[in-house]
């Protein structure tokens, strides 16, 4: 028989740098999860992706055990990295803060494909282009 799920926790953590400090500690502590065990397992699995922020979905079961799924980095993070920016525009559509090429958009779309609700690469590219526009990043050919 399957274990009963008591909670699902969604966090965005830097790869290989999860610590018991907030936001990890309080989020897991209130569900009775062994925080150090999660940190060790997460850091071991993400050590090769250093410097990236990764969304993680932690499923907590009735017996206080847990499993977690690491997703692809947020599109906004990948776009800022591609454009060489620290943050997006404070006034998107009015103030353009960076540029990315169609080739970069395609690479990001390929990376994000498993997590996007898109059937084709073209549809995924349109989603990423929309994210870029909302951040004040211009898409050039």
Curated annotation (Swiss-Prot):
The keyword RNA-binding applies. One or more lysine residues are methylated. GO terms for molecular function: large ribosomal subunit rRNA binding; structural constituent of ribosome. Keywords: Methylation, Ribonucleoprotein, Ribosomal protein, RNA-binding, rRNA-binding. Pfam families: Ribosomal_L11, Ribosomal_L11_N. PROSITE patterns: RIBOSOMAL_L11. GO terms for biological process: translation. The keyword Iron does not apply. SUPFAM superfamilies: Ribosomal L11/L12e N-terminal domain, Ribosomal protein L11, C-terminal domain. Gene3D superfamilies: Ribosomal protein L11, C-terminal domain (1.10.10.250), Ribosomal protein L11/L12, N-terminal domain (3.30.1550.10). InterPro entries: Ribosomal_uL11, Ribosomal_uL11_bac-typ, Ribosomal_uL11_C, Ribosomal_uL11_C_sf, Ribosomal_uL11_CS, Ribosomal_uL11_N, Ribosomal_uL11_N_sf. One of its GO terms (cellular component) is cytosolic large ribosomal subunit. Forms part of the ribosomal stalk which helps the ribosome interact with GTP-bound translation factors. Belongs to the universal ribosomal protein uL11 family. Part of the ribosomal stalk of the 50S ribosomal subunit. Interacts with L10 and the large rRNA to form the base of the stalk. L10 forms an elongated spine to which L12 dimers bind in a sequential fashion forming a multimeric L10(L12)X complex. NCBIfam families: L11_bact. This is Large ribosomal subunit protein uL11. It comes from Thermotoga petrophila (strain ATCC BAA-488 / DSM 13995 / JCM 10881 / RKU-1).
């Amino acid at each position: 028989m399957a274990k009963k799920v008591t909670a699902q926790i969604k966090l965005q953590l830097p790869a290989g740098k999860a610590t018991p400090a907030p936001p990890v500690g309080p989020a897991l502590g209130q569900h009775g999860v062994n925080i150090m065990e999660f940190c060790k397992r997460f850091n071991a699995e993400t050590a090769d992706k250093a410097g990236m922020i990764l969304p993680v979905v932690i499923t907590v079961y009735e017996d206080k055990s847990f499993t977690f799924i690491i997703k692809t980095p947020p599109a906004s993070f990948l776009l800022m990295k591609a454009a060489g920016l620290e943050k997006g525009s404070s006034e998107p559509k009015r103030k353009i803060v960076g540029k990315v090429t169609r080739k970069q958009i395609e690479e990001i779309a390929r990376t994000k494909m498993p997590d996007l609700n898109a059937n084709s690469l073209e549809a995924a590219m349109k989603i990423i282009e929309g994210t870029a526009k909302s951040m004040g990043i211009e898409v050039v050919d």
